Amino acid sequence: NYLSKNDELRKGDSLVSNNGEFKAVFQDDANFVIYGWQPLWASDTYGSDAIRLCMQADCNLVMYNGSGQARWHTNTSKGDCNMCRLFLTNEGKLVLNKESTEIWNSDKNKGSK
């Protein structure tokens, strides 16, 4: 369960860890939240007009509104790549890999508005 380049989540979509214990949800209020038994991490974008969360070909995970304006991103634009992947670990952490090397994770960074 992961996002690769050019994949996207819409409101209500989610990623689930392989062990099924954690879920990352792009909520209807535009907040992207990791849940275990309780919320563990959030993009803090609740109430924004964002409608989709896109894994771009440059390895930047970006939340856009309906007009195509960025509302949040991981600030990981690194140029085109062969493989870019966002996944939720069995420990409840979002990890973004470029060419199998970690370039961002939710434990160390909230992302940027």
From Swiss-Prot:
The keyword Cytoplasm is annotated on this UniProt entry: no
What GO terms fall under cellular component here? extracellular region
Q: Which UniProt keywords apply?
A: Lectin, Secreted
- What miscellaneous comment appears in this entry? Does not bind alpha-2-beta-1 integrin (ITGA2/ITGB1).
Could you name the domain of life of the organism this protein comes from?
A: Eukaryota
Q: What is this protein called?
A: B-type lectin plumieribetin
Classification via SUPFAM superfamilies: alpha-D-mannose-specific plant lectins (SSF51110)
Recount the PTM note: Not glycosylated. Not N-glycosylated and not O-glycosylated with the mostcommon O-linked glycoconjugates.
How does it associate, per the subunit comment?
Homotetramer. Interacts with alpha-1-beta-1 integrin (ITGA1/ITGB1).
Tissue-wise expression: Expressed by sting venom glands and is also found in skin mucus. Not found in other tissues tested.
This chain's function reads:
May contribute to some of the local and systemic effects of envenomation by the scorpionfish. Preferentially recognizes mannose-containing carbohydrate structures, but its interaction with single mannose residues is weak. Potently inhibits alpha-1-beta-1 integrin (ITGA1/ITGB1) binding to basement membrane collagen IV in a divalent cation-independent manner. In addition, moderately inhibits both laminin binding integrins alpha-3-beta-1 (ITGA3/ITGB1) and alpha-7-beta-1 (ITGA7/ITGB1).
The cross-references to SMART domains, in alphabetical order and at most eight, read: B_lectin (SM00108)
Q: Does the keyword Cell cycle apply?
A: no
The upper taxonomy is: Eukaryota, Metazoa, Chordata, Craniata, Vertebrata
Instruction: Give a GO molecular function annotation for the protein.
Output: carbohydrate binding
Location(s) in or outside the cell: Secreted
InterPro entries named in the record? Bulb-type_lectin_dom, Bulb-type_lectin_dom_sf
Boundaries of each Bulb-type lectin domain copy?
A: 1-109
